Amino acid sequence: YLGATVIFLCFLGLLLYKGFHKWWLLLAIILALLLSYGKNLPWLTNVFIDHIPFYNKFRAVSSIQVVIELCIPILAVFGLTQLFKPEAFKKNCFKALKIALLTLSGICLIFIFFKNSLFDFVGLRDGQYASYFGQDFVEALRKDRSALLTADALRSLLFILFMAAVIWAYLKHKINQNITVVILGLLILLDLAGVDRRYVNNDNFRSAIKVDKPYQANEIDKLILRDTTVFRIYDNSDGSTKASYFHNSISG
C-alpha cells in the first residue's frame, strides 16, 4: 500500500518539479505498471520474458511493482522539496495544490458515487460460494465489497483533504516549515499504518513458548509415546496437527 498521502505528494512532484529526473521516474512507473499485468498484456510481457536477461526468473510478474513503490515516494520527496522553495515560487505551488486536490479528490468521489457503474463486485469464487452457502450469501458478500470500496475511497479523500489543508496553511504562512513536515509525516504514518495493520497486527504475533511448544501432551499421548515399536496412528478428530506433532501419523 503506497498511501493516498504519498500519492498526493507524488502528484505535486509531477506538477512542480521541472528536473529531468521526473521523466525517467514517470516512465519507470508506467512501464512497471504495464508489466505487472502479465498475461493480460502479452505483447509487452513476452518481449521482456524473451529478451530481457533474468526477467523470466521472477516468480510472479507483480514483483515488478516494487519499482513503482520506489519511484512514487521519490517523486513525493521532490514534490515536498518544491513546496519549501523561496517565496517567488509560491504562486506555482497554489496552482499545483489546487490541481492535485481537485484531481485526486475527484477520483475518490467517482469511486464513492459511481462504484456500481464501474464494478460488478463479482469474485472468481462466487459460483462456488453460491453452491455452498446459497445466493443470498453471495449477494451479501458483494454488498460488503461495495461498502469496503466506499469506506476506503472516503478514507483516502479525507487524508487528501487533510494533506491539502496542511500545505495550504504553510503556503499562507499559518504554520512554519518544521510544523508542516511533522504534521505531514504523521498523516503519512497514520495512512500507511492504518492499512498495514489490516494485514499484520498484534494477532499475527505469538509468544516464543507457543511457537516452541504449540501443543501439550495429554495422558493418551504419553501412553502412546511409551510404545517403541514401529507404527502409525490414525487421528479422526478435527483435523488438528497435534497427532502429527507427537507421533508418526498416517496423514503425515
Regions found by a protein language model. Give the residues of each.
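Conserved luminal/periplasmic juxtamembrane motif of membrane-embedded glycan-processing enzymes
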Residues: Y1-G252
